[in-house]
Amino acid sequence: MTDDEMYEDYDVDDDSAEESGNESLDDTEYDDAATQEFDFDENQPQRSLGKLTRQKSFEVLNKDDLFSESHKIIKEVKDVLSIPSEAAVSTLLRHMKWNKEKLIERYMENPEKLCIDAGVPNVMKLNATIVEKSGNVSCLICLEDYPPTQTFALICNHRYCLPCYKNYLEIKVSEGPECIYTPCPAPKCKVIVHQDAFKQIVSPEVFERFNNFILKSYVDDNPQVKWCPAPGCIYSIRCDRKERKEAVNCKCGFQYCFNCNDYEIGDHMPCPCSQVDKWLQKASDESENVTWMLANTKKCPECRSPIEKNGGCMHMTCRKNAGGCGFEFCWLCRGPWTEHGSTTGGYYNCNKYDKSKAKEDDDKAHDAKTELEAYMFYYHRYESHRNAMKIADEQRRNAHLKEQQILSKFDVRSADTKFLMEATEQLLKNRRVLQYSYVYGYYLDKKSQERNLFEYLQEDLEKHTNLLSTQYEQSLDKLEDYQAFIKWKEQVTNYTRITKKFLDNFVDGVAGGLVNTQIN
């Protein structure tokens, strides 16, 4: 495994931290410090991260790696249980969700039951023996007669011609991953068509697809290995920790949370997974519609239909053409409009209001409206950075086009355009963190002292990220000559470095001072 296929976490070396004295955090290189457990004391200055030690924590796997691993497990089980056929062991492992230890245990307890349940009634012999006869064999599908050598049967002895068997297996493979559990074509037969039978009967292309589905089952059934969720990515990642907090980096370039394993979510630092789940549920939950209704409508006192006020007058009518009952009432106290006049303060006022139960209802509505406004504040900013992140991702993918324009206009070296990719990658990282920082901020205790630090660091990161975005998006048409290009390049390069420091400061602030903050 190459260094590129390994991602590394970092732990703080306390001794080196003491030696570093007041060394600035800005000059410290680190990846995922945001989720390290730090003790926060508001009366003490935050310590430097000091020297960072590396720990290998996850591994990127390609198809060859998966094949080697799965084949190694098959061979180990084969040797332990003295089963002669790897195809039989493969079928047993798939039945046991690739749990080697559990398979061996169950096989030792009751091998006959396990094998029957797995569709391998005889691990010593998988296929029926061809008996040479003077006559032909009748295929049970097409009912045509064939020489025995042109037919095939599993140990269950349900014999079919090779063309029919081939067609049956290819259809199963075309239907998807469940083909690895394909049973014998005979009705109600539970014997599984093993790997060697597929290899013998179908084309090499179809057999390769079948093997790919076996590798897929190896990943899908393994809690420590997951496919990278990026569209079109062929890699998987193994993580040896059950609840990994840091993001993982796939060789395809996508960075994401291993636990969530969701392309749309990606890397949700600084939020914990549970917080993201809660936020996404809130965003899609119908209860939010109920909150809006409570905050912005009142129910007709007669038929209880929700009514939204669209004018200044307190005289409300529950419109029949909108499904109402026609009842006329006061918006403030919800009493009949016939009881309102000069004695109650006039038609545009109501001095009954404070004495009515409507006051209690309106207090609840006011609280709901306040909560809704707070949610919308954070949600709009979450969405804004989410959209900006998509733009940054597109800019990163199109950086080579801007590079070609620069090379052709200013006759510079290819190395002089490296800053473009660095800037877009930094923008992408910043936007992703800013997106989820508003989720984190929404659930942060409104009265906590740490909130001020959080919002201060968030504001700094947001401001300088926007400045870098503005610098990067400058039109090349405005760069009149080589000197103008060099000046622009220096500005973008410097701001890329600056925004990285602000991102690092934000990450360190969350890790060092906010991880123990009470979350509502």
From Swiss-Prot:
Domain of life according to the entry: Eukaryota
* Coiled coil region boundaries: none
* Entry's EC annotation: 2.3.2.31
What segments bear the compositional bias annotation Acidic residues? Answer: 1-42
Binding site residues for Zn(2+) 5: C300, C303, C318, C325
What GO molecular-function term can you cite, just one? zinc ion binding
UniProt keyword annotations, A-Z: Metal-binding, Repeat, Transferase, Ubl conjugation pathway, Zinc, Zinc-finger
Residues bound to Zn(2+) 4:
C257, C260, H268, C273
- Regions crossing the membrane: none
Residues binding Zn(2+) 3: C228, C233, C250, C252
Catalytic function, reaction form = [E2 ubiquitin-conjugating enzyme]-S-ubiquitinyl-L-cysteine + [acceptor protein]-L-lysine = [E2 ubiquitin-conjugating enzyme]-L-cysteine + [acceptor protein]-N(6)-ubiquitinyl-L-lysine
Q: What class of enzyme is it?
A: transferase
The record's region (TRIAD supradomain) falls at: 135-354
Active site at which residues? C313
One Gene Ontology term from the biological process aspect of the record: protein ubiquitination
Residues reported to bind Zn(2+) 2: C156, H158, C184, C189
- Stretches annotated zinc finger (IBR-type): 208-273
Q: Disrupted gene: resulting phenotype?
A: Prestalk cell numbers are reduced in slugs and these prestalk cells do not localize to the tip of slugs. Development terminates at the finger or slug stage, and these slugs do not phototax, possibly because the tip region does not properly form.
Q: Which residues bind Zn(2+) 6?
A: C330, C333, H340, C350
An annotated GO cellular component: ubiquitin ligase complex
Q: Which family does it belong to?
A: Belongs to the RBR family.
Q: Give the matching PANTHER family.
A: RBR FAMILY RING FINGER AND IBR DOMAIN-CONTAINING (PTHR11685)
Domain notes for this protein: Members of the RBR family are atypical E3 ligases. They interact with the E2 conjugating enzyme UBE2L3 and function like HECT-type E3 enzymes: they bind E2s via the first RING domain, but require an obligate trans-thiolation step during the ubiquitin transfer, requiring a conserved cysteine residue in the second RING domain.
Q: What does this protein do?
A: Might act as an E3 ubiquitin-protein ligase. Appears to be required for normal cell-type proportioning and cell sorting during multicellular development. In addition to being necessary for a normal percentage of prestalk cells and the organization of the slug, rbrA is also necessary for spore cell viability.
What name is this protein filed under? Probable E3 ubiquitin-protein ligase rbrA
